[in-house]
Every structure is written in structure tokens, then in C-alpha cells.
Amino acid sequence: MKLLYIVPKLNNEGGVARVLSLKLNYFVEKFGYEIHVLTQNKGDFPLFYSFNEKIVFHDMILSGKAFYFFNAFRKSLKEKVEAIQPDAIVVCDNGLKAFAIPFILSGEIPIIFECHGSKFVEEKQLKSDLISKIKLSLKYRFKDFSANKFSKVVALSNESLSEWNVNNGLVIPNPCWIQNDISADLKSKKVITVARNSYEKGLDRLLLIWEKVIKKHSDWILEIYGDSITYLQPIVSDLGLGSNVSLNEPVKNISEKYLASSILVMTSRSEGFPMALLEALASGLPCVAYDCPTGPRAIIDNEVNGFLIEDGNVDSFVQKLESLIEDENLRLQMGKNAKESIKKYKIDGIMEQWEELFKGLNCLKV
């Protein structure tokens, strides 16, 4: 089986890059698939995560404004697919150009859309004027129309699938790469979050929450790991959080950081199926997260392995986070439940679902 994955970038430390390193390596090492990856890495190597040396990477060099950018994308895509001749194509791109792929590649090759984010994901705060609202509505209608042109739409949770008005969808969650018997002892006075500094990840919201928390718990530290994280320093300084917030660039030994923490927090405005939550639960950490679209609800069992907070409810978030800070027994019980809840995300069972999907599609005329 020859598979082509289309991904914007893999030369970063994000959750999509993490999960694709797991899955693509598994396809090569366990199933013997031939894997090709088409990216816009712009030749920036080495990759942050480890990919099997048999995986073949192809780079699209795209530039210019909208029309020229899209035309270069269309031309490069057709040339690469013609050269590779894959048995199936998997698109892991939430950008608008990804939804044009079924129209660009109108051939016999099955094309799967693997959705790693909310349909309503936005990279910046939306404008409220009428023209902006009309543009937004048209964009979502185009996404729905295009999604039905894919051979399959694979969502990571039932909640994510319900966002799409499609009749060709199914759910296959992400696997968790941390599978061991070690758990955090939950005695440290550290709260951790792992996220890139972007509008959708909502780290600005987290700092406002943390400002309230340390008024009672000034001996606790919030550790943030992610790219472009230093841009948060002015906010940290303005809020007077310098002694209680540690800003850190991405690290490859992130599992050690989870084990040295007691709680994970997530304040994203939108998600797909956040790997940070899976990793934290696998490390035995209770989690507190906003119930944003989509992902946290599928992973956190409220009041069992963590707390799911009404999106944007700062006071509720502070209250639940403080309850975990103040009650070690509650942390320990939720941490134990967290470890148990991660078992259903073992990689073997999830990858078997992907193999069955590919086998089925190759038996169909598309």
C-alpha cells in the first residue's frame, strides 16, 4: 500500500506532527506501507519528532498572494500526485486550500480528510461587521460542501464529526504515545500547559486565570511549554506574574515535565483531539480544561479524571483548579482515574481501524 499524506508543516513540535510521527512510523514498521508526505516545510530540517528513514518527504515551495499562492499549490499538488501515484491520499490540513483538493484531484484515487481541528477554528479574533460575517458564513458552507467530496472524513471524536454536515464520516481517535506504568506523584507545586502561543490555544486566557489563582497560592508555579512563547513575557510582566510563571521553549523530553507536575490546564478556544491532554492523563495528571469545540469533552470525564469547564467561565475554572491545588487526595484520586482512562487510546487498536479503512477504500470505485 502506497499512501500520500498532505500536511502543511511537520517541522514543528505541535500535536499534529507528534501524532503523525506515531502513525506514519507504525504504517512503515508494522504494516510495511510505503509512505510519502507532501509538506510546506520549505526545506527546514531536521524534524522535531523522529520519523522512520523510509518515509519520503516532498516539499512544496509556495509564495505570493492568494491567487498566485493557490495556483502554485494546485500545480505542485498535481505534479507530485502524478509522480508518486499513491493508492490513497490523506489530507491533514485545516486550511481553506485543503478543501479544494477533491476538485483539483478529480481522479480515481481515494482522498481522505483527517480532521485535526474544529471546523470553526480561527487563527485570530473574528470581526463583527456584516461583511465579515457573510464571508465567514460562505467559508463554512464551502467547507461542508467540499467535505462531502472526500472519499471519507475521519474525525477524532463524535463531537468533532457532529460539526460536519457529511454522510461519509467516521471517528478514529488519536493514539497516545505514552504507555508506561510510571505516574507523577502529584506532590509538586507545579501546573503545566503545553501549547503553541496562538490565538486558538488561548494562553492569554490562562494567564488571567493564573493571576487570580496565585492570590491564594503564591507558592505554586505555572510552567508553559510551546513555540513563540517569549511573546507572552510582556503579559506576564504586566500582570505581575514573573515569580509564578515559567515560559519554556518546546522540549523533546516533555514526558519528564509531565511527571514533575501535579495538574495540566488547557484554555484553548478550539481544539481537535489535543495530544497534551492524552499525554498528561497517561502521566497520571488530573486535567482542567475549557469545554471548547472540540476535543476536551471527548477526553475528560468531568469530575472523574479532571474538570471540564464552561468555555470562558473564568470563575469556575479558578474554583476547580484551586480545589485540586488545595486537596491532594482529590488530585491523587483523579490522577489514578486519569491513568486508567488512557488505556482505550493504545496505538495497536487505533491503527487497526486505519488499516481497515484503507483496505475498504481500495475495494471501492471512487
Show which residues each predicted segment covers.
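N-terminal strand-loop element at the rim of the active site
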Residues: I6-E13, Y26-Y68, E163, S228-T230
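Short hydrophobic beta-strand element within catalytic cores of glycosyltransferases
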Residues: P286-Y290
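A conserved mid-protein helix/loop that constitutes part of the nucleotide-sugar donor-binding site
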Residues: G14-L22, K189, R196-K212, D315
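Membrane-proximal helix-turn-helix segments that form the acceptor-binding/catalytic region
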Residues: S132-V153
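Short His-centered aromatic/hydrophobic patch
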Residues: V91-K97, C115
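Aromatic "clamp/platform" in nucleotide-sugar-dependent glycosyltransferases that forms part
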Residues: P250, R269
